[in-house]
Swiss-Prot record:
Residues 2-31, 39-68 form the 4Fe-4S ferredoxin-type domain. It is an enzyme of class 1 (oxidoreductase). Binds 2 [4Fe-4S] clusters. Cluster 2 is most probably the spectroscopically characterized electron acceptor FA and cluster 1 is most probably FB. One of its GO terms (biological process) is photosynthetic electron transport in photosystem I. InterPro entries: 4Fe4S_Fe-S-bd, 4Fe4S_Fe_S_CS, PSI_iron-sulfur_center, PSI_PsaC. Its EC number is 1.97.1.12. The gene is psaC. HAMAP family: PSI_PsaC. Keywords: 4Fe-4S, Electron transport, Iron, Iron-sulfur, Membrane, Metal-binding, Oxidoreductase, Photosynthesis, Photosystem I, Repeat, Thylakoid, Transport. Changing residue 9 to A: Decreases assembly onto PSI cores (in vitro). This is Photosystem I iron-sulfur center. It comes from Synechococcus sp. (strain ATCC 27144 / PCC 6301 / SAUG 1402/1) (Anacystis nidulans). Its cofactor is [4Fe-4S] cluster. Changing residue 32 to R: Decreases assembly onto PSI cores in vitro, FA and FB seems to assemble normally. GO terms for molecular function: 4 iron, 4 sulfur cluster binding; electron transfer activity; metal ion binding; oxidoreductase activity.
Amino acid sequence: MSHSVKIYDTCIGCTQCVRACPLDVLEMVPWDGCKAGQIAASPRTEDCVGCKRCETACPTDFLSIRVYLGAETTRSMGLAY
């Protein structure tokens, strides 16, 4: 299953998304673009299951991190309705 995790420059470096991820897909890396001096990164997207807990945990109202589900997941979710 392939999902895409996008981190945007509105990240405030709070680490909430990293702590919310049950599979350690995310990590913080140095970045001078915010006061915290760090930004979330997603080096292990192949482990992402698309639970979107990182999105829910983000205090910037989904403006900093988004999980785009792969087509296979989107199709199977449609069958549930």
